[in-house]
Amino acid sequence: MNKAEDLWNILTWLGVENRPFYRFRSTYCVMGGYGGYKVVGHKNLESLNAELNTVMLRRKKDEVLDLPPKIHSTEYVELTKKQQIMYRDIKNGIIADLENILTSVNPLSCTLRLRQLTGGLFTEENPKLERLMDMLSEENIPNGYKALIFSQWEKITEVYYEALKEYNPAYIVGKVSPEDREAEKERFQNDPECKLAIGTIGAMGTGFTLTKASYVFFIDKAWVSGDNAQAEDRAHRIGTEDTVNVISLVAKGTIDEGIEEYLIENQDLFDRVVDGKGSKHDIRQVLNNLLKI
C-alpha cells in the first residue's frame, strides 16, 4: 500500500476518517492525466502523517530486521554519436519552447523523450543494454545469481525483455494481469532457470517479494526517490540472504545525471515541481539543472 488514497478504507474503518472518499482524495492527491482522473502525485502530506500518527506506531526496517547490506553504485555509459545528435535536437526544442513549458500543467513531461532516448528507445544502438549484458555476465548471473531490472516505461522493458531471453526472464508490467504477475513472481523465486525479473517501477516495484535477486539494475529512475527505494527493496526484505547490489545505469552528460543529483541532494525542490506546487522559478531551476542549460 503506497498511495494516499489506499489509506481511506483503513482510516475509515478505524474511525479516524469521516470524510467521503472523493474529499479525502482531493485533499491528499494531485490529479492529472486524461480527464484528470489519474493520481499523479500527493499533497498535504504533513496533515496526512499527523492523522496516521494517531493510529500507527512506525519502526524503520533497519531497526527491526537483521538484513544483509545493500550497496549502491552507478555505472556510466556514453551515448553513441547518433544518440548524441538526437539528444541535442530534442534538448534544443525544449529550450526553444521553455517559456511555454514553464506555465504548462506538467512541465517535466517535456523531458520524456530525452529520458527514453538514454534508455534505448528510438535507435537500434543501446549502450545501456550493451553494458548491462556485460555486467550480467561479469556478475555470474548464469551461475546462480539473479537480478531485477527496472524501468519507468513498458516500451523500454520490452526492449530488454526481448534482448535478454537467454536468461528466461519473468516479466511484470502494467498490462500483465494480476494472476500472471503473481505467477511470474513465483517463477522468479522458485525456478533456477529464471535468472531475471524485468518490469516497470510502477508494476514490479511494489507488492512483491523478490528476495532471490542479489542485483537490482535501474535503466532509469522514477522522479520520486521513495518509489525507487520501494522498487529496490523488493530484493531487500525478510528472506534476503545475500548482499543486494543496486546499480543505476546513467548516460554521461545527460538528464540521467541531473536526476541522480536531485534524488540525492535536492529532493524537496524536485518534489514541489513533480507535485505541481513549484513556482515558475522552481521549475526553471529544475529544468536548467536537468538539461544543463
Please report, for each region that a protein language model flagged, where it lies by residue:
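Conserved P-loop NTPase motor "coupling/switch" region that bridges the ATPase
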Residues: M1-E63, T240-T243
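Conserved nucleotide-binding/hydrolysis micro-motifs of P-loop NTPases
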Residues: M1-K3, C29, K81-Q84, E154-I156, ...
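Conserved helicase ATPase core of P-loop NTP-dependent helicases/translocases
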Residues: L148-F150, E158, E166-M204
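A conserved SF2-helicase RecA2
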Residues: W223-I293
